[in-house]
Design a protein with these regions (language model features):
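Mobile gating loops/cap/lid regions near enzyme active sites that modulate substrate access
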Residues: 68, 73, 90, 389, ...
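Active-site rim elements
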Residues: 82-87, 166-171, 238-247, 369-382, ...
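Glycine-rich nucleophile elbow surrounding the catalytic serine of serine-hydrolase chemistry
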Residues: 121, 202-212
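Substrate-access "cap/lid" subdomains that shape
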Residues: 186, 212-215, 220, 229-230, ...
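Alpha/beta-hydrolase fold nucleophile elbow
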Residues: 191-203
């Protein structure tokens, strides 16, 4: 039997991996995909990595990108969940990627999965314990997790930057993602991967990133499928529609000027001379991170720069101005619910007229209950599910042949804190990495994780999540959205939901926004 690929050559030199915990998989950690973005390359588009001599041992994760480390506060759900090591190495030199491959031969042409981590484009890293690519790789997939620039390092805009490089004035973190994915396309055959069968995926801000990549003219033909987890919010009773989370270049440049003035930075040259930790601390104080929202809270949003991002990514997707590849979109059952903030029926009627105009009566009929409390409960909806429905309805109108899939994670999450299916809780299951979590998961949780990982792996392979589980059994049928208008319910057991499960208010909102979009 052939050995696994423990040593191989990429465009800049030889790399050596090491057996993962599962000896059927080889991992390569810390492969440089671009030059260090330091000095004169700070706030520049990623540049080619330099060649190295000999064989590069890729046995440990590279430093994480510059960020405010969340620490290990036991009273904070997210720091408790991911247990981020406060001593983890952090450096501006962070443009590296990690690969898990089960291939025995370089010509196997296995499907490829490229993962963009979340964290609000402010924090996060591919070394988080839930992102272990081993279990997906065991299913015959080459898994790649990438690092990219964040916060002020990844999304600063400034008139001097625009004058210096008008073709890449900002969005450096998004450019890193695209550059890494292009590196994968050029080099993944060396690890037994198929450069013509790449799926990109991400969760939260990683899911938003996937949407930007889906709509960028610079990524045409780069990937064949995409997975978006908890990455889109649409609609709000409060009138603040967060579906775009974009800035124009002019707005972003104004933010950059404001930051420089606040920090006492005279010009771009001076900013590039600042030590990275000093710059990070200045930005933390400017943005009010850790002490409420400050003026910098939009500085890590994608920017409509006219080159990489041509418009609001969600609006472009809703108008089918995207790469028309199959999508798999998911959300969790407890995250991001919206409910009208009113105290009386009269206030609700006023809100309905403000939000829905001449269709306010339809809305009120859809949510009507025996009393105010029941009516407000009927008005609850998940903006992430609404965003998915709008995306898929828009696709079906012009591309009925394209099959898209949706799921809601509704598994029970054990633990003394009784957290529900909180935002990001599904990551342990999709990567089947429950054993790394502190929570007292039992057999049914491991069964669900196995199924979810198999569904996702099947989609990565073929664009269809249906097929065999890793244990050889046939997975419960998952119908495409165009077939049933419903989601797969990730739970014990997994169950297909149909159109009848959609609430009246969700039906109304979907129709209302589709007509509004035009």
């Amino acid at each position: 039997m052939a050995d696994l690929i423990k040593e191989t050559r990429v465009e800049n030199g030889w790399v050596r991996g090491v057996a993962a915990a599962d000896p059927r998989v080889i991992s390569y950690k810390g492969i440089p995909f671009a030059a260090p973005p330091v000095g004169a390359l700070r706030w520049r588009a990623p540049q080619p990595a330099k060649d190295w001599e000999g064989v590069l041992d890729c046995v440990r994760f590279a430093p994480i990108s510059m960020q405010c480390k969340p620490g290990t506060d036991p009273n904070n759900l997210y720091t408790r969940e991911w247990n981020v090591d406060p001593e983890i190495p952090m450096d501006e030199d962070s443009l590296y990627l990690n690969i898990w491959t089960p291939a025995k031969e370089k010509d196997e042409r296995l499907p490829v999965f490229v993962w963009y981590f979340g964290g609000g484009l402010m924090e996060g890293n591919p070394a988080e314990m839930e992102f272990n690519g081993e279990r997906i790789a065991r299913r015959g997939i080459v898994v790649v997790t990438i690092n990219y620039r964040l916060n002020v390092f990844g999304f600063l805009a400034h008139p001097e930057l625009t004058a210096e490089a008008p073709d890449a004035p900002t969005n450096f973190g998004l450019l890193d993602q695209a550059y890494a994915t292009k590196w994968v396309k050029r080099n993944i055959a060396a690890f037994g991967g198929d450069p013509e069968n790449i799926t990109i995926g991400g969760q939260s801000a990683g899911g938003r990133s996937v949407q930007v990549q889906l709509t960028s003219p610079q990524t045409e033909g780069l990937f064949q499928k995409a997975i978006i987890m908890s990455g889109i919010r649409y609609g709000s009773y409060q009138g603040v529609n967060s579906h775009g989370m974009n800035r124009t270049l002019e707005q972003a440049e104004a933010d950059g000027l404001d930051f420089f003035q606040w920090a006492g930075i005279r010009n771009l040259a001076e900013a590039r001379q600042l030590e990275s930790h000093t710059l990070m601390e200045l930005f933390r104080n400017y943005a009010g991170i850790g002490s409420g929202l400050g003026p910098g809270t939009k500085m890590w949003a994608p920017v409509i720069d006219g080159t990489f991002q041509l418009g609001h990514f969600s609006e472009m997707i809703l108008k089918n101005k995207r790469h028309m590849v199959p999508l798999l979109m998911t959300n969790t059952s407890s995250e991001s619910w919206e409910m009208p903030q009113v105290q009386t029926m009269a206030e609700l009627e006023t809100l309905a007229k403000e939000r829905f105009g001449h269709r306010s009566g339809e809305f009120l009929s859809a949510v009507q209950g025996e009393n105010l409390a029941q009516t407000l409960e009927n008005a609850k909806y998940c903006p992430m599910e609404l965003g998915m429905r709008l995306y898929f309805e828009a696709t079906a109108a012009e591309h009925p042949e394209l099959q898209n899939y949706s799921a809601v994670f509704d598994g029970d999450i054990p633990g003394w804190d009784h957290p529900g299916t909180f935002h990001s809780s599904d990551l342990w299951f999709v990567f089947e990495s429950l054993a790394s979590c502190w929570r007292p998961f039992t057999g049914r949780h491991y069964d669900l994780a196995r199924q979810m990982c198999s569904y996702v792996s099947n989609f990565i392979k073929t664009g269809d999540p249906n097929g065999k589980d890793v244990d050889g059994s046939t997975l419960p049928e998952w119908k495409s959205y165009s077939t049933c208008k419903g989601q797969m319910r990730y739970a014990t057991p997994c169950k297909q939901l149909d159109d009848l499960s959609v609430s009246p208010v969700m039906r109304f909102l979907t129709d209302f926004y589709l007509h509004q979009i035009g």
